[in-house]
């Protein structure tokens, strides 16, 4: 990791050094995803079977995972892992239940009543990546709030063969239907519907560049998505009180997600920065994914800040997905931290806790989107509607205001909708 003293940089250099690595979502990916979209649209299930054999090397005779398969998978989960998943589920449920909306019902002025009511999104689709390290924890993060929100139908797609952990967790969380479908084709199947796959209203979940491009495309049509996605990232703010072994472990735990991940350390102490760099090398030697981690570290940075105030400024400008604060009084910085997907305060709040079991959601905006997007929560699985109801007296008292404004905007029919009612009022 390159070490840079922040105050030695010009303003132009500062902007450049906090830029993310360029995402490889080029024309080739877009063209490949376009072809998949057309194939699924025209050929439905047949396309899904063909693409599964082509990309996953699995020849399926059905797309829906049976109850017997789910039960068999669940029986293979160890008691130790079951207990861990259930503990995480309990914590995540508690935190997301606390997010339930309070209904708003106000009399704005006499005879004018306004409300906000919340309704669940009817049908949601969850995408869970497969591969050598199946993300069953993401099932918890998506299915639990969907269930609490009251979504009527929850379906899940994951590339075959689906791991026992994903099947068990999905069943535990109340997912109704599980499809053995992966990649961009899963996104298009859920967005468009096929003979076997239910059309959904909103799609959630992470994925590779092809899945991300497919989500971008469906979001331009009639299917909503959770948020824009990019490579995973973490920024750590640390002062002289931080333990370099802790800081190193937090940076490495994020770097192991992928070669395109980025990790940033903003330290107020050069000694800590040097000790952390040495700790990274020691710990790296123990990791099975060391090659991937090294690639991520190649475009990662250590910044030396002159103060915690400057460290906060750097963090707010970078706007990380994960922000870890390892300082003497970490909570005191919280009021000044404006842009982050999830914040981890103190030496004993590693990102791993939020990734799995503290209760917060690990589905977070990346690539600087935390300046405008929030971490996933209960609100993402529902929508708000406003309601207004006026009595004749309330209508009359507000009528002139609306007529004047409608006339000023030259919307005569808007004014008329008020005038015809006024003419029939006897109050």
From Swiss-Prot:
Oxidoreductase found in the keyword field: yes
Names of required cofactors: Zn(2+)
Positions annotated to bind NAD(+): 127, 185, 208
Stored CDD domains: Histidinol_dh
EC number: 1.1.1.23
GO molecular function, one term: histidinol dehydrogenase activity
CC annotations in GO: cytoplasm; cytosol
Binding site for Zn(2+): 254, 257, 355, 414
Cofactor annotation comment: Binds 1 zinc ion per subunit.
Residues that, per the record, bind substrate: 232, 254, 257, 322, 355, 409, 414
Catalyzed reaction equations: L-histidinol + 2 NAD(+) + H2O = L-histidine + 2 NADH + 3 H(+)
GO biological process: L-histidine biosynthetic process
Pfam families on file: Histidinol_dh
Coiled-coil regions, chain positions: none
Keywords: Amino-acid biosynthesis, Histidine biosynthesis, Metal-binding, NAD, Oxidoreductase, Zinc
PROSITE patterns named among the record's database cross-references: HISOL_DEHYDROGENASE
UniProt cross-references to Gene3D superfamilies, sorted A to Z: 1.20.5.1300, Nitrogenase molybdenum iron protein domain
Pathway(s) the chain acts in: Amino-acid biosynthesis; L-histidine biosynthesis; L-histidine from 5-phospho-alpha-D-ribose 1-diphosphate: step 9/9
Catalytic residues (UniProt): 321 (proton acceptor), 322 (proton acceptor)
Family named by the database record: Belongs to the histidinol dehydrogenase family.
PANTHER family, sorted: HISTIDINE BIOSYNTHESIS TRIFUNCTIONAL PROTEIN (PTHR21256:SF2), HISTIDINOL DEHYDROGENASE HDH (PTHR21256)
Reported function: Catalyzes the sequential NAD-dependent oxidations of L-histidinol to L-histidinaldehyde and then to L-histidine.
Protein name as annotated: Histidinol dehydrogenase
The organism of origin for this protein: Haemophilus influenzae (strain ATCC 51907 / DSM 11121 / KW20 / Rd)
Primary gene name: hisD
């Amino acid at each position: 990791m390159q070490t840079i003293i922040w105050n030695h940089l010009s303003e132009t250099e500062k902007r450049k050094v906090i830029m993310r690595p360029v995402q490889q979502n080029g024309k080739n990916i877009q063209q490949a995803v376009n072809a998949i979209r057309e194939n699924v649209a025209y050929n439905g299930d047949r396309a899904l079977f063909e693409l599964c054999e082509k990309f996953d090397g699995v020849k399926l005779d059905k797309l829906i995972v049976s109850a017997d398969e789910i039960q068999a998978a669940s029986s293979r989960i160890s008691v130790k892992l079951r207990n861990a998943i259930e503990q995480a589920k309990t914590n995540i449920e508690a935190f997301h239940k606390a997010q339930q909306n309070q209904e708003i019902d106000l009399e704005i002025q006499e005879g004018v009543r306004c409300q906000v009511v919340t309704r669940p999104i009817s049908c949601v689709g969850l995408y869970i990546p497969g591969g050598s390290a199946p993300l069953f924890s993401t099932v918890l993060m998506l299915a639990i709030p969907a269930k609490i929100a009251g979504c009527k139908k929850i379906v899940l797609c994951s590339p075959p063969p689906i791991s026992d952990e994903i099947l068990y967790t999905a069943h535990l969380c109340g997912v109704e239907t599980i499809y053995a479908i992966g990649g961009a084709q899963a996104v298009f199947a859920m967005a468009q519907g096929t003979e076997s796959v239910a059309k959904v209203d909103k799609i959630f979940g992470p994925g590779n560049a092809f899945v991300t491009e497919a989500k971008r495309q469906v979001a331009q049509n009639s299917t909503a998505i959770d948020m824009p996605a990019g490579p995973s990232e973490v920024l750590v703010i640390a002062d002289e009180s931080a333990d370099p072994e802790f800081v190193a472990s937090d940076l490495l735990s994020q770097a192991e997600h992928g070669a395109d991940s980025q990790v940033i350390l903003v330290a107020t102490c050069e000694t800590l920065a040097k000790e952390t760099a040495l700790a990274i090398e020691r710990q790296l030697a123990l990791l099975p994914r060391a090659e991937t981690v090294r690639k991520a570290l190649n475009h990662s940075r250590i910044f030396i800040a002159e103060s915690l105030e400057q460290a906060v400024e750097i963090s707010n400008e970078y706007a990380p997905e994960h922000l870890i604060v390892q300082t003497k009084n970490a909570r005191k910085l919280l009021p000044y931290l404006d842009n982050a997907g999830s914040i981890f305060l103190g030496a004993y709040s590693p990102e791993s806790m939020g990734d799995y079991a503290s209760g917060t959601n690990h589905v977070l905006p990346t690539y600087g989107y935390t300046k405008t997007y929030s971490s996933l929560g209960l609100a993402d699985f529902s929508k708000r509607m406003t309601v207004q109801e006026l009595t004749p007296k309330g209508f009359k008292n507000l009528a002139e205001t609306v007529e004047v404004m409608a006339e000023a905007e030259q919307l005569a029919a808007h004014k008329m909708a008020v005038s015809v009612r006024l003419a029939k009022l006897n109050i």
